[in-house]
Amino acid sequence: MPAKGRYFLNEGEEGPDQDALYEKYRLTSQHGPLLLMLLLVAIAACTTLIVITFSYGDPSRHRAVLGTAFFTLAMFVLLYALVYVECLDRRGLRISALLIWGCLVTLGYVLVFDFDSPRKDTLCLWGRCPSSSFVVFVVYTLLPFSMWGAVTAGLVSSISHLLVLAMHQEDFTSPVGLKLLATAVVFVCGNLTGAFHKHHMQDASHDLFTYTVKCIQIRRKLRIEKRQQENLLLSVLPAHISMGMKLAIIERLKERGDRRYLPDNNFHNLYVKRHQNVSILYADIVGFTRLASDCSPKELVVVLNELFGKFDQIAKANECMRIKILGDCYYCVSGLPVSLPNHARNCVKMGLDMCEAIKQVREATGVDISMRVGIHSGNVLCGVIGLRKWQYDVWSHDVSLANRMEAAGVPGRVHITEATLKHLDKAYEVEDGHGQQRDPYLKEMNIRTYLVIDPRSQQPPQPSQHNSKNKGNATLKMRASVRMTRYLESWGAARPFAHLNQRESVSSSETLVSHGRRPKAVPLRRHRTPDRSASPKGRSEDDSYDDEMLSAIEGLSSTRPCCSKSDDFSTFGSIFLEKGFEREYRLAPIPRVRYYFACASLVFVCILLIHVLLLYSMKTLGVSFGLVACVLGLVLGLCFADVFLRCCPALGKLRAIAESVETQPLLRVSLAILTIGSLLVIAVVNLPLMPFRDRGLTAGNETGLRAVSGWEMSPCYLLPYYTCSCILAFIACSVFLRMSLELKVVLLTVALVAYLVLFNVYPSWQWDCCGHSLGNLTGTNGTLSSSSCSWHLKTMTNFYLVLFYTTLIMLSRQIDYYCRLDCLWKKKFKKEHEEFETMENVNRLLLENVLPAHVAAHFIGDKLNEDWYHQSYDCVCVMFASVPDFKVFYTECDVNKEGLECLRLLNEIIADFDELLLKPKFSGVEKIKTIGSTYMAAAGLSVPSGPENQDLERQHAHIGIMVEFSTALMSKLDGINRHSFNSFRLRVGINHGPVIAGVIGARKPQYDIWGNTVNVASRMESTGELGKIQVTEETCTILQGLGYSCECRGLIDVKGKGELRTYFVCTDTAKFQGLGLN
């Protein structure tokens, strides 16, 4: 267990990395809007200075405005440079935001009161409402304030402006109070729409950050899964075989996911290659069967794992590759997958080291065991056959000969052939092995053998060896298995899958969730957090993770999105480059779009209040606003139909319209155009219809106007409020955050052109305001006198309209960029999540191809179990099924590619056998391994041990299922014979009883079962007859109880068991042919 392993990240465990990453994201995501804001303000300041200096008389009379404008411009340029080079930290950006807000507010007040002018004109006083509205708007949308900070700054800007207006009024007549109330409505609308805008952008910003983090986490997990997958594959198969098999699995999963049913090939894929000039070593532990019968399940697994773990270390040191473990038999090859010139010396050295290791065990524990080693050099076919429980194996006549050399060997010695001796180049002394006297096959093939003399045997024993022997004698009173276990545990062999459990950490920032909520306890499942301080690798991986996060977060900054290079967007404009993705983005649903229409309706209400409070009461006012109110009411009714009709289930179709507004682009865009267009029109529709004064009317006849209107103000005083109405209509267009940028640009541009034409070309109100509304305002040269008003009202109206238009266009461009980024990261997250799931499925399939599913859960579950896996079972049915004729069929010649085509047929046989395991009927049958042309399986391993699972009927049912599985194998083999024109027949042996199951081997973990039941089942197969199923007497009794008939064969001699009475199961031909068809 790691020193600082954590399985959960609780609420108090959020490290500084999480806060730092989120703060970095928040500030970086504000860089673009902040720079945009500075640029706009600089342009506005420059424009104002130009207007002051060159268009309106003597600039010396406006020194306060000029000084403030120049200071503000210089401040903005300095801040722009500082933010552009990103030299401001969190506190610096906050201070810069406050400075910008302060400069804007100050400049607004100076514009309201030109203190150097001869008189403070009330028209200028009321005409600066748009400037304060601009400050309120940018506080929410462009400055990096929090929500509470923006609300505070917006309210301060609004209230202070209202207070200034109120304090500079000589008398509070009815029109003054109404104008103050109308101004307050403008500010309330500005604050509410700004807060709406900021709230939705914060939500979108959190979502974007969340998906960015998730996407990076998925990428990291994907890399981890790929490494785990490679480690897992390499723990079972060599690299040159595993990569092809992995690609085949991924392709198969993709075909299944895409539901593409491609026509099957006539043959299954064969992953077998031929290698020449290799040496094969077989080693068997003599006396282990007797020792194993005395071991408990855990002791047996520990002993095997420690012994074979030691052998794996020896194999690695001697450049040998372990192939497989068969019970207590261990065999390996030197010269795979890369040819080695000293392969024979490697194997001999390994054999001598194995004998020495067992000798040390024997001397230390007093247990009578020894090592028998056989080696032969030649050629092999190596690879994987079958579909399930892949195990790397070797086949050839030379492999069979090496196996014979081990069987004919001498305990404690290395037995080699003459072929191996020739490759040793006299590196070792040898003596005659007399193998022909102990094995008939060696005699028949006239194979001369030798025994290698260990150079260490000629050296005097070390004193430490005597000490360990004396220490071993002191413990002889213990059971042999206990002595063996205690001694071998001191070797400290690695546990199975230990390299898979030491997995890369997942940063605590993975627990980030949207809206900044702290996560509750989140299980990390298979991922753990190692002690990075003690692991340079851990630190580098963590640093790379942080670097990747920071790189992605900086990519979210859109300071210059149009100019920056991107693999996802076009060079000019935010258009997706991927074919079809642009259309997918535009047709994607927009959640919560109903609230855009609700906010636009709020803007309509505010415009209505302004008109009702200040403008002339005309029939056209009621008609126009009444029509728009009906239109907006209908739109809101469609958007909120599910809410309004919640109590009427019968009107389900009408309620579905609300969902259609979010999901149907045509309906959504149509309603948006109708809503925005109505607001843009209603803002000025009554302006041309106002009863302006006749051009011939003099200033002395102003009472006539008052008599007509009942108001003590001229239309010129109402122009700022018409301007505010137009600005509010502009803002109503911007609250449709996820709507098309092109649509916003078109609507705003058309509206701006119409407003400018109306305010600059329409003659009546211009003559009224600029000619006679304030008395004699024109000079002798026909120009506006500077003493009449500090600012030209028409010019400032144009300035405010263009300022808001430019700001909203650039802001909409920014929002569109973020919406596209959000959509892009969601798509990347979905794609990489699918990749991650594919990798997880591949890992699961790989692991389940190494271990049974219930055993795999022991290693990959939430508990991260690192203990030995061992399990004892009281009743398991074991089957061995072999194709003995395949040994005769197998030949090595040029016609069959040195045996490769023979193995192709064996692969088809084993693969067809494996396909039977996919049938639900045989779900309880577990394939253990293949040994050459022998197929080993067991039933009853998935049932947990314990008193509650000792149901005899269930245990006996496993035996019946195994018999049916055997008959199905026979049927499959008959089908292969018909297609390949062969006459193979299956020889089956079945036995049931207690077994021990476990996982052994650290470098190549392998699931296996041991026990007398397994040995007897193997003997039932080897002593059986072709086309028959041989069982023991105990198994026969149970089968007869299940309705099977058995034929007594009689007593046969079984190696290690003496004489046993066996039986043949009477299999009905039609029955197993039907099973095969099923």
Curated annotation (Swiss-Prot):
The chain crosses the membrane at residues 34-54, 63-83, 95-120, 125-145, 150-170, 176-196, 595-615, 620-640, 669-688, 718-737, 746-773, 792-812. Residues 515-529 have a biased composition (Basic residues). It is a multi-pass membrane protein. Catalyzes the formation of cAMP in response to activation of G protein-coupled receptors. Functions in signaling cascades activated namely by thrombin and sphingosine 1-phosphate and mediates regulation of cAMP synthesis through synergistic action of the stimulatory G alpha protein with GNA13. Also, during inflammation, mediates zymosan-induced increase intracellular cAMP, leading to protein kinase A pathway activation in order to modulate innate immune responses through heterotrimeric G proteins G(12/13). Residues 477-482 are annotated as: Mediates regulation of adenylate cyclase activity by C5 alpha-induced G- beta and gamma pathway. Phosphorylated by PRKCD. Residues 503-512 have a biased composition (Polar residues). It is found in: Membrane. The gene is ADCY7. ATP binds at residues 284-289, 326-328, 372, 929, 1008-1010, 1015-1019, 1055. Belongs to the adenylyl cyclase class-4/guanylyl cyclase family. It comes from Bos taurus. InterPro entries: A/G_cyclase, A/G_cyclase_CS, AC_N, Adcy, Adcy_conserved_dom, Nucleotide_cyclase. Its cofactor is Mg(2+); Mn(2+). It is an enzyme of class 4 (lyase). SUPFAM superfamilies: Nucleotide cyclase. Residues 491-499 are annotated as: Mediates regulation of adenylate cyclase activity by sphingosine 1-phosphate-induced G alpha 13 pathway. The protein contains two modules with six transmembrane helices each; both are required for catalytic activity. Isolated N-terminal or C-terminal guanylate cyclase domains have no catalytic activity, but when they are brought together, enzyme activity is restored. The active site is at the interface of the two domains. Both contribute substrate-binding residues, but the catalytic metal ions are bound exclusively via the N-terminal guanylate cyclase domain. This is Adenylate cyclase type 7. Residues 506-584 are annotated as: Modulates adenylate cyclase activity by modulating the binding of G(s)alpha to the high-affinity G(s)alpha binding site in 7C1a/7C2. Pfam families: AC_N (PF16214), Adcy_cons_dom (PF06327), Guanylate_cyc (PF00211). Activated by the G protein alpha subunit. Activated by the G protein beta and gamma subunit complex. Activated by GNA13 and GNA12. Ethanol and phorbol 12,13-dibutanoate significantly potentiate adenylate cyclase activity generated in response to the activation of the prostanoid receptor by the agonist prostaglandin E1(1-) in a PKC-dependent manner. Inhibited by lithium. Residues 455-476, 502-545 are annotated as: Disordered. Mg(2+) 2 binds at D284, I285, D328. It catalyses: ATP = 3',5'-cyclic AMP + diphosphate. GO terms for cellular component: plasma membrane.
